[in-house]
Amino acid sequence: MFSRASVVGLSACAVQPQWIQVRNMATLKDITRRLKSIKNIQKITKSMKMVAAAKYARAERELKPARVYGTGSLALYEKADIKAPEDKKKHLIIGVSSDRGLCGAIHSSVAKQMKNEVAALTAAGKEVMIVGVGEKIKGILYRTHSDQFLVSFKDVGRKPPTFGDASVIALELLNSGYEFDEGSIIFNQFKSVISYKTEEKPIFSLNTIATAETMSIYDDIDADVLQNYQEYNLANLIYYSLKESTTSEQSARMTAMDNASKNASDMIDKLTLTFNRTRQAVITKELIEIISGAAALD
């Protein structure tokens, strides 16, 4: 009764909805898998935000008394206006970061300023050596400045920094054998929960301080006293920079994890909407097939 072409055409029409249904079912499985994955990630980011918030609260409390160390140590340099002579060539740059990531551009901002400083000093004919406090700063700079690395320190940022940690770093620098004339410490200075600023503070060697012209206004300064002051001053500045950097890092991580959690919520909402639309399309197609089949039987 029917031609061969008609039968083939009918078979093709009958098979096509099945392929569409299989494709939609596969899409639903993919969406379900993605939703589950994103929800798990969101749980992690929310937990990390809570941990960072607790660490930030402690770091901010400890930062206020630590700032006294920094301002006190810089007072002599500012009052006496100590500067290294232009003919002094050896310069030391200390970059303060940590071993942990997921905190925005905290580490890259310090690395960027260090690169700019190294380039400027090298162009001026200075001999520049780098000290990295934290694995992150070493990971960023070591590939391009490996020949300028004097020493690096790890296990930074896992626990709140103490003055003992700063003293160990200062002692290691003084015993490194590199007799620098002047230098700088580059770190992130905490401003508020949502902002920080990359700062640079000066440091000077014992010889530079002792031979500075402005030091003549101070009478009867014993050499041992001046040496003790210079060593203590270096530890103070490192401690201050560690505290500022830690507070900035925890606040940045808290903000980054909060943004990640919000982005995950947006993705979950969009995927849920897509899932519902796809499921509704599958149900509609199945109903059409049932109705069409029932109508054909009638």
Swiss-Prot record:
Phosphoserine, modified sites: S146
Keywords: Acetylation, ATP synthesis, CF(1), Hydrogen ion transport, Ion transport, Membrane, Mitochondrion, Mitochondrion inner membrane, Phosphoprotein, Transit peptide, Transport
Transit peptide: first to last position: 1-25
Pfam family, one: ATP-synt
UniProt entry tagged with the keyword Membrane: yes
UniProt-recorded Gene Ontology molecular function terms: proton-transporting ATP synthase activity, rotational mechanism
A single GO cellular-component term on record: mitochondrial inner membrane
Main localization of the protein described in the UniProt heading: mitochondrion
Any one GO BP annotation for this protein: proton motive force-driven mitochondrial ATP synthesis
N6-acetyllysine: residues carrying this PTM: K39, K55, K115, K138, K154, K197
PTM annotation (N6-succinyllysine): residues: K49, K115, K154, K270
Record-linked SUPFAM superfamilies: ATP synthase (F1-ATPase), gamma subunit
InterPro entries recorded: ATP_synth_F1_ATPase_gsu, ATP_synth_F1_gsu, ATP_synth_F1_gsu_CS
Similarity comment: family membership: Belongs to the ATPase gamma chain family.
Biological function: Subunit gamma, of the mitochondrial membrane ATP synthase complex (F(1)F(0) ATP synthase or Complex V) that produces ATP from ADP in the presence of a proton gradient across the membrane which is generated by electron transport complexes of the respiratory chain. ATP synthase complex consist of a soluble F(1) head domain - the catalytic core - and a membrane F(1) domain - the membrane proton channel. These two domains are linked by a central stalk rotating inside the F(1) region and a stationary peripheral stalk.
Quaternary structure and interacting proteins, as annotated: Component of the ATP synthase complex composed at least of ATP5F1A/subunit alpha, ATP5F1B/subunit beta, ATP5MC1/subunit c (homooctomer), MT-ATP6/subunit a, MT-ATP8/subunit 8, ATP5ME/subunit e, ATP5MF/subunit f, ATP5MG/subunit g, ATP5MK/subunit k, ATP5MJ/subunit j, ATP5F1C/subunit gamma, ATP5F1D/subunit delta, ATP5F1E/subunit epsilon, ATP5PF/subunit F6, ATP5PB/subunit b, ATP5PD/subunit d, ATP5PO/subunit OSCP.
Protein name: ATP synthase F(1) complex subunit gamma, mitochondrial
Organism: Mus musculus
